[in-house]
Design a protein with these regions (language model features):
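Residue-level recognition of tetratricopeptide repeat
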Residues: 62, 96, 130, 164-167, ...
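Structural signature of tandem alpha-helical TPR/SEL1-like repeats
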Residues: 76-87, 109-122, 144-159, 166-169, ...
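TPR alpha-solenoid repeat register
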Residues: 99, 133, 167-170, 204, ...
């Protein structure tokens, strides 16, 4: 699964980025993204002035100077010294609202979110018209996880603000809070409102892209991300988000370009190499996919997901030892992921380690007892060991969990037929075909063989014809048809079908079936 969760907190413009990974890439599964960019605009749109508060009272004037000094220290990131001065100002002038506001901002910067909330609320209690405190309260409540409270605070700020105030940051933050509440329509409206106030506000365009994507409006989301990038070409988060949407739009080349831009801007940007590897993999560019996943591992060596997808790529690349090692490492890092043990089982079976494969599948099933894919794969390896009763039970369990598992029906049918149970095999193949899967010509051929076993030659012939209509170059269907014509006494047709099968087997250099087909032709030529 593509990594999509983005968490970003921006102080002033774009400052601190933290991207959290979500999900994993299963061997069999769908893309389930969850992009959530969080980039709070944290400087109040309303200028915080204390010079207007100058009074004839020496004590008050002294407190105001303390606040001014504290503000300067806070801007220099000398937070502890700033806190001391804000508290001195409050002690001297308990009604000095800017001191409480500055205290709240500084406490939030120090990570004391509840302290910040209390300070902003105290400022509002003293002066309900002091708009910066509502803005600061909204930020602190959002960071605490109280999105509803943040929405109320931002709305109060907007209502109390003067007409000439640039409300773009407030509407942007309001959009983030609505998005977190899953109120996507209001989030879209808020981000659009932010853009109305400031058409060049890159964060707002990026936020708009995020919620449009969640609405399923991918084309507009891509346009919004591109606009954010146009306004802020160095904005790595927007490039990353664009890459995700392009990937989902199956524009893998475009996604690669976007992710590569991220690596240029921020080489240590979390998950970018993982997602870049996925895009290469979709283009079947396995060398670049493998190299990129290795880069992702260098960046995050304890990420089991990366080892799992790397194992999958190695498996498809027929590099079985590397696949087994990657899946094994994935299961060591995180032994609670069923799909990783399933992948390990696939690799071990290909290495001939059947007992190891069985153990891996059993661990997969222990983690997820409803994992139909693992039961199907367990059935295959049990069948390899001629433990046919257990294999049949495993295939039936896969089907019981997932009645649409065409592969399990197909495997069950082949095993039942090999056990002489052609009637049940016919039923299994028919269900496979009804559900549908890749390479159905194989299943039509198997169905034809099962019909022939039962003497239902007309139905067998139709099944072979259907197989060849789907894949005219499937040698086993031609061979099966040759055997059928032989049973019907149609020698010339039989020879013709066998000769077509022989040509295809020779192209594939299948020595065993070349010999069998030659023997069948020779036997018929002796009849003519």
């Amino acid at each position: 699964m593509i990594k999509t969760a983005i968490t970003k907190i921006a102080i002033t413009n774009i400052a601190i980025t933290n991207i959290a990974a979500v999900g994993l890439f299963p061997l069999i599964g769908s893309l389930t993204p969850a992009l959530e960019p969080i980039a709070l605009a944290q400087t109040s749109p309303t200028p915080v002035r204390v010079d207007r508060l100058i009074s004839q009272n020496d004590s008050a004037n002294s407190s105001i100077k303390l606040v001014e000094q504290a503000n300067s220290l806070r801007e220099q990131n000398q937070l502890d010294r700033a806190l001391t001065l804000y508290r001195q100002a409050i002690a001297a002038s308990p009604e000095l609202v800017p001191a409480y506001y500055g205290l709240g901002v500084t406490l939030r910067q120090k990570g004391d979110i509840q302290g910040a909330i209390n300070a902003h609320r105290q400022a509002i209690t003293i002066d309900k018209s002091y708009t910066p405190a509502y803005y600061g309260l909204g930020i602190a409540l959002y960071q605490k996880g109280d999105s509803s409270g943040a929405i109320d605070a931002y709305q109060q700020f907007i209502q109390l603000s003067k007409a000439d105030t640039n409300l773009a940051p407030a509407y942007y933050n309001l959009g983030l809070a609505y998005e977190r509440r899953n109120n996507i329509d209001e989030a879209v409206a808020s981000f659009r409102k932010a853009i109305e106030f400031d058409p060049k506000y890159a964060l707002a365009h990026n936020g708009l892209g995020t919620v449009l994507r969640r609405q399923g409006n991918r084309k507009e989301a891509i346009a919004a991300y591109r606009k954010a990038i146009e306004l802020a070409p160095q904005y790595a988060v927007a490039h990353f988000a664009l890459g995700i949407s392009l990937y989902e739009d199956r524009d893998y080349t475009g996604a690669i370009e976007a992710y590569k831009r991220v690596t240029t801007l921020e080489p240590n940007f979390p998950n970018v190499y993982y997602n870049l590897g996925l895009a290469y993999n979709q283009l079947s560019d396995r060398p670049n996919a493998i190299a990129t996943f290795r880069k992702a591992i260098e960046q995050d060596p304890r990420n089991a997901d990366i080892y799992a997808i790397l194992g999958s790529v190695f498996l498809r690349d027929e590099n079985i030892p590397e696949a087994a090692e990657a899946f094994k490492r994935s299961t060591e890092i995180n032994p609670k992921v069923a799909s990783s043990f399933n992948g390990l089982g696939l690799a071990l079976r290909r290495q001939g380690d059947l007992e190891g494969a069985i153990s891996a599948y059993q661990k997969s099933i222990a983690i997820n007892p409803n994992y139909a894919v693992a039961y199907n794969n367990l059935g295959r390896v049990l069948s390899d060991q001629n433990r046919n009763t257990e294999a049949i039970a495993a295939f039936r369990r896969a089907i019981a969990i997932d009645a649409q598992n065409a592969v399990a029906y197909s495997n069950l049918g082949n095993l039942l037929r090999s056990q002489g149970n052609s009637d049940e095999a016919i039923d299994a193949f028919q269900k496979t075909i009804a559900i549908g899967k890749e390479d159905l010509w194989v299943d039509y051929t198997s169905l034809g063989l099962a019909y022939a076993d039962r003497g239902r030659l007309g139905e067998a012939q139709n099944a072979y014809f259907k197989a060849l209509s789907l894949n005219p170059n499937f040698a086993k269907a031609h061979f099966g048809l040759g055997a059928l014509y032989t049973l019907k006494g149609e020698v010339s047709n039989a020879i013709r079908s066998y000769q077509e099968a022989l040509k295809l087997y020779e192209e594939n250099r299948d020595a065993e079936w070349i010999k069998r087909t030659q023997q069948a032709i020779q036997a018929l030529q002796g009849i003519t």
